[in-house]
C-alpha cells in the first residue's frame, strides 16, 4: 500500500495542499503511484525552499503552486532536489513579458532591443516564467516551459555558461556533443526542407547546443515517442543522465490502460 506524503497527519498550523488534484494533468498521469509519491515529496520540499513570486497582478493559489512545483521536480525526480540549488525564487508573470535585450553582432557592434519572452533562467539568479505558457505545459505535446528552464539550470552546473552538456562524466562528453550536434543538424535539415512551422521538432532546438538540450528535454518528458525513434543514441544518453525512461513509462501506462479496458465487464 502506498503511503501518500500529503495524507500524513499535518500540524494544526498547516493546510493540506491539493496534491492529488495537482497530479491530474496529462503529463503526470503516466507516472506510477510510487513515482507520484516520490514526486510529491520533492515538490513539498521545493515549495519549502523556493519562493514563488507572482507579478503584474497574477494570482497564485495552492493548486497552481503545487502544479508548478511538480513540473520543476519532474526532471530531478531521480537526480535529487539539490540539482536545483542554484536559484531560490521563481518569478511568474500572467503572460509573456517584455525585456530589454542586449546583443553583439559579428563585427562587434552592441545592439539593444525590447523583445517578448516566455521565460528566462539567470545563471545565479531566479527563473522567470509566465502562467499562460505554464498552463500549456500540462499536456504531453512536446512543449514545456518549466522543463526548458530547468534544463538550462542543470546545464550550467557543468560550468560558467550553458553549453548543452550537463554535468556528466568527462569520458561521456565527446559522445554527448557528437550526438547533440548530429540532432541539431538533422533538425536544421528538416527546417530547410519543410519550414520552421511544419518541423516536427521545435526549430529553436537548432539555434545552439544549449537550446537544443533544453528543447529536447521538453520532448524527452512530454513527447518521448517523437524523440526516441528519431535520435536513439541521444535518447539513451538523456535516459542515463536523467535516470528516467519516459517512453518506457508511457508504454507501461498504455499497456495498463489496455489491460483494464479488456477486463471491463
From Swiss-Prot:
Cofactor comment in the record?
A: Binds 1 zinc ion per subunit.
A GO-annotated cellular component: cytosol
Q: Which key words are in the record?
A: Aminopeptidase, Cytoplasm, Hydrolase, Metal-binding, Metalloprotease, Protease, Zinc
Q: Which cofactor does it need?
A: Zn(2+)
The UniProt entry, under CDD domains, shows: Peptidase_M90_mtfA (cd20169)
Gene Ontology biological-process annotations = proteolysis
- What InterPro entries does this protein map onto? MetalloPept_cat_dom_sf (IPR024079), MtfA_enterob (IPR057256), MtfA_fam (IPR010384), MtfA_N (IPR042252)
PANTHER family, per the entry:
MTFA PEPTIDASE, PROTEIN MTFA
Q: What does this protein do?
A: Involved in the modulation of the activity of the glucose-phosphotransferase system (glucose-PTS). Interacts with the transcriptional repressor Mlc, preventing its interaction with DNA and leading to the modulation of expression of genes regulated by Mlc, including ptsG, which encodes the PTS system glucose-specific EIICB component. Shows zinc-dependent metallopeptidase activity.
Which NCBIfam families does this UniProt record tie to the protein? PRK15410.1 (NF011939)
Kindly provide the name given to this protein in its UniProt entry. Mlc titration factor A
